[in-house]
Amino acid sequence: MSRPVGYGRYLEEFTVGQIIKHWPGRTITETDNTWFALLTNNQHPLHSDAHYAAQTQHGQRVVLGPLVFSIGIGLTVADVSGRAIANLEIEKIVHHAPTFKGDTLYSESTVLDVHESRQGDRGVVSVETRVRNQRGEVVMTFRRKVLVPKKTHPTLGDGNQQR
């Protein structure tokens, strides 16, 4: 199976301290939140009951946090894990501010660590991702570790080899 040219990065293309701005963003719709609530069976009224939510400190329904995370990480795939062999770890998910329908999310990742594995043809990249809304407010941060190939990896190297 071939991958789109420019989709994902090899281990050699990551450097500690590198900041990757993921584009484009993604605007959250009411349908997104409703379907995600149905898929995950999350029935909390803060997410589904407009009358209840209007009486809270937020004054309106709040988008589910796991949906914010899913969109936030999805925005990073083309730049961070598009060539991944595996996602190894996700940690330290922090909600900093609520997200509402109509908000547009943008992700930005900082490379925290890059090291080659013992196999020599792959390595682990650690990143911290900040998810911001259209006002530039950080709504969520999380860290993850991704196993990515080097350019010399026998089956994933150039991204165009058939399996």
Locations of the language-model features?
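Hot-dog-fold acyl-thioester-processing enzymes
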Residues: 1-89, 151-163
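HotDog/MaoC-like acyl-thioester-processing domains
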Residues: 1-18, 95, 99-104, 108-163
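Conserved interaction-surface patches within small, structured recognition/assembly domains
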Residues: 91-93
